[in-house]
Amino acid sequence: MSDSAPVHVLIVGAGAVGCFYASKLHGIHSGRDVRVSLVCRSNYKAIAENGVQLETHSFGNYHFTPYRVFSSIKQAGDYTEGGAFQWDYVVVTTKALPDITNDALDIAPLVTRGVDGSCIVLIQNGVGIEEVHRAEFGQNPIAKPNSLLSDSTLLGQLSSVTDKHIHQLVSWFTANGIRDAEFASELSLQQTRWHKLCINASMNPSSVLSGGTPNARMALDSELRTHLHACMNEIFTTAPKILGIEFDAKKHASPDRILKSTERNTGGKPSMLLDWQAGRPMELEVILGNPIRIARRDGLDMPRLQTLYALLKMAQTRKAEEANPTAKL
């Protein structure tokens, strides 16, 4: 990728996060023509014909027209104008479901391999999601931001190759109004990921197992609050032993602060509950299974999370069996 050539970015997953990400990358940044395309599935026809209408709190309502729109990964992989260009950034924003699909193998047709090949950017929940990509694309730059829709956007490198791709992303986001975008070390990024589990690994599964209880109501219920606090505390005590670094009280809210904040957040439902109610697979492995397995590799137990994982995994299995007696998860 020369300094004068267009930069080709492909977003795999045209949901809310993917479309927002795309809209903030597409355009001319510091003289570079960044062309962002989308791989859509169920919404392909609508986006191909009409583009994307975004409604945001920080940036208002606006319209975004992608450079190209594809109905499948295969179609996007075939489209490189006869090999005239590569996908410089392959950005994955789909749900991470390693028990169902291998994301690295799925995106393989899109990736130009090697140090100077495609940079793989993983905007997905959970921990351990990068391992299959490291195994498949050992020389490619791999980045795993925290949530783009949070108050700040940390972008960090998860491979041993150059970090120029990440610095480019940070500069493009900053130029387009995301002022808190910043580069982070792999260790700092992993720490942020583990801290996010305090919410995702405690409240999401507990909401499903308690019959669809919203986060705020769980935080106000004395028994559930005790349970949630214990789950968060388990992460707070285990993660530093795995990462070798303590949480920073200035950057990472304590369980007490998280629960206090949750009391006031009465809107919305946890994503795992929405998936459960819609009959979709839940992100059990990356939010619960992977942390438990990573801890075990270091000789550590996470009994609270393991209990949630065991119960919810069986509940999902039973639900699938009831819907289709031949289904096996």
Residue ranges of predicted features:
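Helix-loop-beta segment of a Rossmann-like dinucleotide-binding subdomain
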Residues: 111-114, 143-156, 208-220, 269-277
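NAD(P)-dependent Rossmann-like dehydrogenase/reductase catalytic/cofactor-binding core
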Residues: 2-8, 74-81, 225-329
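NAD(P)+-binding Rossmann beta1-loop-alpha1 motif at the extreme N-terminus of oxidoreductases
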Residues: 1-68, 74-75, 82, 89, ...
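Rossmann-fold dinucleotide-binding core
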Residues: 123-196, 202
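Short alpha-helical
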Residues: 42-46, 98, 127-128, 164
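Active-site-proximal catalytic alpha-helix in oxidoreductases
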Residues: 190-217, 223-236
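Rossmann-like NAD(P)(H) cofactor-binding subdomain of soluble oxidoreductases
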Residues: 65-144
